[in-house]
Amino acid sequence: MQTDADVPPCILLLEDLHESEMGNQVAGCDPARAAIALGALARLHASGWGDACPQMGHWFINGDIVPRLFHAQYRNNRRSFERFAAERLSEHGMAHVKAIRKTGLARITRLHDAAPRTILHGDFRLDNLFFAADGSLAAIIDWQTVNRGPGALDVAYFIAGSLPPETPEAVIDDLLSSYHGALVTAGVVDYPFERLLADYEEALLLLLHRMSGLDQLEFGDDRGVALMDTWFERFDARLQRVPL
C-alpha cells in the first residue's frame, strides 16, 4: 500500500482558459473559423516537417505502425461496422467502406511511406480547441495521441468533422489552399499544393479505417449520439470527391 511518502514530489500546472470559448464539434464551424484552426495546424506541422520531425520519442506513437493498426481494427470490426455505416453513409461512401477491405492497406501504407512526415496531433477537432475573444486560436488540448505521419491526416480529420455537409468542395479547396499557404509561410517549400490535394483524398480513406471502431464505443448521453451521427454525415459529404 502506497503512502504519501512513496509518491515523488510533482507539480500540476494548469492554464487558465476561462475567458476562451471551447469549440463545439456537434455545432461545427464556418469556413472562417476553420481557416484559423488550419493556420495553427500548419504552423504545428511546419515545426516538425520532414527532416525536422523527431524520429523517436517516448511521448508519441510510432507512425510506421498506424496503417496496420487501423487496418487490423477494420478487419476485426468489418461486419458490424458495415451494418453501422450502412445507416449513415451514402452508396458512394459504402462503396469505399467495402473497397478498403482489399485496397485500403496498400493505399494508406503508400500515403505514409510517400508523404513527408511531420508531428501529428492525432485528434485535431473542434472539441479540443479553444478560441480567444478576438477569434484567434487560444489553445489546443488533448495531446495523448501525438504521432508521426502525413500532415494531411490531421487536415482531413479536422475538415471532415467540422464543416457542414452542404459546404461546397470549392470552399474545401480554399481551406486546403489556406493551410498550404501557411505551411509555405512557415518554411515548407517542397510540398506542392497538388500533392496536398492528392494526400488529402487518400487521408479521407485512412479515416475510414480509423472510424471502423466507432460502433464499438459507448456514446453515452445524447450529445455523444449526436456527435457520431453528425460526424458521419459530414464525413460522407467529403468522401464524395474521392474516386473509387
Regions found by a protein language model. Give the residues of each.
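Short beta-strand micro-motifs within the conserved protein kinase catalytic domain, predominantly
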Residues: 1-8
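Conserved short submotifs of the Hanks-type protein kinase catalytic core
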Residues: 9-20
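ATP-dependent phospho-/nucleotidyl transfer catalytic cores
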Residues: 20-121, 133, 227-241
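Hydrophobic HxD+1 residue recognition
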Residues: 124
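Catalytic-loop signature of eukaryotic-like protein kinases
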Residues: 127-130
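Pre-DFG segment of protein kinase catalytic domains
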Residues: 139-142
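Active-site activation/catalytic loop segments of kinase-like enzymes and analogous catalytic loops
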Residues: 145-187, 203-226
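All-alpha amphipathic helical-bundle segments outside canonical DNA-binding/catalytic cores
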Residues: 188-204
